Amino acid sequence: MATSTERAVLAGGCFWGMQDLIRRYPGVISTRVGYSGGDVANATYRNHGTHAEAIEINFDPAVISYRTLLERFFQIHDPTTRNRQGNDVGMSYRSAIYYTSDEQKRVAEDTIADVDASGLWPGKVVTEVAPAGAFWEAEPEHQDYLEKYPNGYTCHFVRPGWKLPVREKAVS
């Protein structure tokens, strides 16, 4: 049992596929899908305003670091398409990192700089980085969706051989 846990909130398109892949990583204790980063209180699937479909992750940082979690996040979705993942188009499907501490913000910005420098994606990263606000849990039918419906829709996948290099830091 973990002695301390951290919380991460990520958005990268339809939350079904994000949850299905992220929950499998060693060190991920729990996940739930919902809505975050927007303007509607008590958001629902039918009424989520400007929120993104997001996943809340509780993880053990002794097993998986926040940096590693973000590297995997960038491996399973395209962070260079604004308001879109696969066939899903709209603000709900934007790429976003909602940080819970100054350290998470620093790691997020550093990881994005590495993704941009790597050339692994065809364009510049458009992932939003913003403080975590309210997280509105999605309806029960959306939780663990692809576990219930293994052949259900997803546009997320692990890209084989994808490894994010760390860029050379400028000497100050």
UniProtKB/Swiss-Prot annotation:
KW Lipid biosynthesis (keyword) present: no
GO molecular function, one term: peptide-methionine (S)-S-oxide reductase activity
EC number: 1.8.4.11
UniProt xrefs under SUPFAM superfamilies: Peptide methionine sulfoxide reductase
S-S bonds: none
Keywords assigned: Oxidoreductase
One Pfam family here: PMSR
Isomerase listed as a keyword: no
Catalytic function, reaction form: L-methionyl-[protein] + [thioredoxin]-disulfide + H2O = L-methionyl-(S)-S-oxide-[protein] + [thioredoxin]-dithiol; [thioredoxin]-disulfide + L-methionine + H2O = L-methionine (S)-S-oxide + [thioredoxin]-dithiol
GO biological process: protein modification process
NCBIfam families in alphabetical order: msrA
Function text: Has an important function as a repair enzyme for proteins that have been inactivated by oxidation. Catalyzes the reversible oxidation-reduction of methionine sulfoxide in proteins to methionine.
Family, per entry: Belongs to the MsrA Met sulfoxide reductase family.
HAMAP family in UniProt: MsrA
Protein known as: Peptide methionine sulfoxide reductase MsrA 1
